[in-house]
Amino acid sequence: MGALPSGGAPKLVTGPRFRSPSSHSRVYMNRIRNFSIIAHIDHGKSTLADRFIQHSGALSNREMAEQVLDSMDLERERGITIKAQSVSLEYRAKDGQTYELNFIDTPGHVDFSYEVSRSLFACEGALLVVDASQGVEAQSVANCYTAVDQGLEIIPVLNKIDLPSSDPQRVIQQIEEIIGLDGEEALKISAKTGEGIEELLEALVQRVPAPKGDPEAALKALIIDSWFDNYLGVVALVRVFDGALKKGDRIRVMSTGREFQVDELGFFTPKRVLRDRLDTGQVGFVVAGIKDIDGAPVGDTLTSAQKPADSPVPGFKKVQPRVFAGVFPTSSDDFENFRTALEKLRLNDASLHFEPETSQALGFGFRCGFLGMLHMEIVQERLEREYGLDLITTAPTVVHEVLTTDGETLYIHNPSELPAPNKIEDIREPIIAASILVPEEHVGNVIKLCVEKRGVQKEMQYVGNQISLVYEMPMGEVVLDFFDRLKSVSRGFASFDYEFKRFQSADLVKVDVLINGDKVDALAVIVHRDQAQSRGRELTDKLKEIIPRQMFEVAIQAAIGNHVIARSTVKALRKNVTAKCYGGDISRKRKLLEKQKAGKKRMKQVGKVEIPQEAFLAVLQVDNKKS
C-alpha cells in the first residue's frame, strides 16, 4: 500500500510536478480526475494500473515491477489486492491539456467491501473492469452498485481481449442485463499488451467529472487509509474535499479532537514526491507526527485546528467485524510481541478488532474480529510471516444476539460466554443475503448446498447462460467452508457476495466438549439443535483420532448443558505387569493387577491430558469432511 521500501531509509523525490497555484485553484481543479477500478479477483486490475504508470512515464522500464501497487508479498502471491493504494499520474491529453489522474486502488474480495466503499467515496468516477473471457462476477456487481449509489460515473472496460477464449459480445450483454450499464460504450483493452490504453485514458479525461469543492472553505480531508512507517510514524492517505492542506498547519482529527502539526505532504507516483500543499480535489499523503495507532482512524475527517469545518465528510460508518476467532501464541513468552504485532497490523486495517482472552486450554491470547474468512487467513498469515509468530487459531464463530430472562440483550462473540440455558429467553443468529451467480449446468448442486446450509431462496433469475440466485441463510453456516464448497460443487464457476441482513430467532444450543469430565472452552461450538447430535458425534470421533493414548483411559464427551449427547473413549496403554511371574499362584498375579488398577485410578484423578494443537482445528475439519 503505497508503502515504503522495506530496506533502508525512504527514497524521496522532490520536484515541480503537480504545481497548483492557489490563485488558479478552480482552474486547476478542472484538470484533476479521481478514479477507482472495480474488478473481480484476477480480472487484471493491478496489471492495468501498471500500464497507466508506464504510459505516464512515472517509472522507467527498469523500475517497473509486475503489480507495482501490490506491495505486500502476500498480495502478489495470492494475486489479490488487500489494502487501498493511491498513485498520482500526469497525462497530456489530445486536447493539449495536462491532467492529474489520481488512481485510488480498491480490493476486490468480498471481505474487503469496507475498503472499497472508502476508496470509492474519494472518487468521481470508476472503471468497471471485466475479464472478456470470464464475464461478470457477483463481487463486481456488488461493488458496482456501491459506486452507482455514490453517484460515480462508471466506464465499462473489457480486459484480456487478446485471449483466444475472449467473447466480448457475450460480456457486453451481461453488463447490460446484470448491471444495467450501456454495454456498447464499453472499451476493449488488453492490460497485458497495452492495447487500447490510450483510448481508455482519453475516456477517463472526457467522461469522469472534475472534483467539486470550495478551495476557500475550511479544510475538510477524508482519511482513505493509514499505515505505520518505522521512520515517520503514522502516514495517512487523504482526499481533500474543501480548503487546502499546507505543510506546517495544525490539523484536528474530527472524531477524537486530537491535534497534530503537518510535517510532510506529497503524492505517490508511485515514488514519494514531497509537496508543500494539497489543494481541493487532490489525493496525497500526510505525515503529522502521529505516533500511536489510533491517531488517524480510517474514514475520519481532518480539519484545521484554527478554523475547523462544521461537519465531517458524510457517509462513513464504523465497520463491524462479523467473524470471531481466538488466536493464541504457541509460546506464552510471545504474548507481548503478539499484542504489539496486532496493534501495528490494526493501523493498516481498520476492520481488525481484538481484545485479550484467556483460555484454560491455550493460555493467554486475543479474541479477534474479522470481516470474513479470507480476512482471517490473511491476518494470521501476515502475523506469522511479518512478525515471526507461531499461532493457534480456534474455529471461527459469528456474533449471536441473546435475550436473557432478565430482559437484557447480550452480543456473544465466543461460545464459552453463552449464559446457562435456564437464563436464556431467546437466541438470535445473524442472517445474510447471499447473491450467487452460477452457470446453468451447475445450479442444481448450488441449490442443494444452500438448502443443506439452511438457506431460503428469495430470488432466481436467468441472465444469459448464467443464473442469479439470492438466498437468505445463517452466517454461522457460511463462515466455515461455504465458499470452498461452492467453488467445489460449481467447478470453480460460481461467484458469491453477501451482506448482513438481520438477527433472527433460531433453536440454537451450545455443544461443550468434556475431556475426562473437564470442559475445554476452546472446543465449544454453537449449532442448531437438529445438527447437535451428529455434530457432537463427529467431534468426539475426530478428537479420539487426535488425542494420543495415555496410561489411563480418556473419556471424550459432547454435552448440551448436563445432557451428554455423544461419547468416545481413548483406550489406556497397558503395561504387562504379570510378565515377570512364571507359573506360581494366581493370587500373586491378581495382586499385581489390582495394584496396577489402583495406580491407574489415582493417575486418572490427578493426570492431565495433553491436548495437541490439531484438536482445536478438529472443529473446522468436521465440516470439511462433508465436502
Curated annotation (Swiss-Prot):
Residues that bind GTP: D42, H43, G44, K45, S46, T47, N159, K160, I161, D162
Boundaries of every tr-type G domain copy: 30-212
Region (Disordered): 1-23
Key words, A-Z: Cell inner membrane, Cell membrane, GTP-binding, Hydrolase, Membrane, Nucleotide-binding, Protein biosynthesis
EC class name: hydrolase
Membrane topology: Peripheral membrane protein
EC number: 3.6.5.n1
Reactions this protein catalyses: GTP + H2O = GDP + phosphate + H(+)
Any one GO molecular function term: GTP binding
Gene Ontology CC terms, in alphabetical order: plasma membrane
Localisation: Cell inner membrane
Record GO biological process: positive regulation of translation
Function: Required for accurate and efficient protein synthesis under certain stress conditions. May act as a fidelity factor of the translation reaction, by catalyzing a one-codon backward translocation of tRNAs on improperly translocated ribosomes. Back-translocation proceeds from a post-translocation (POST) complex to a pre-translocation (PRE) complex, thus giving elongation factor G a second chance to translocate the tRNAs correctly. Binds to ribosomes in a GTP-dependent manner.
Family designation: Belongs to the TRAFAC class translation factor GTPase superfamily. Classic translation factor GTPase family. LepA subfamily.
PANTHER family per UniProt: TRANSLATION FACTOR GUF1 HOMOLOG, CHLOROPLASTIC, TRANSLATION FACTOR GUF1-RELATED
Protein's name according to its UniProt entry: Elongation factor 4
Organism in which the protein naturally occurs: Alkalilimnicola ehrlichii (strain ATCC BAA-1101 / DSM 17681 / MLHE-1)
Gene: lepA
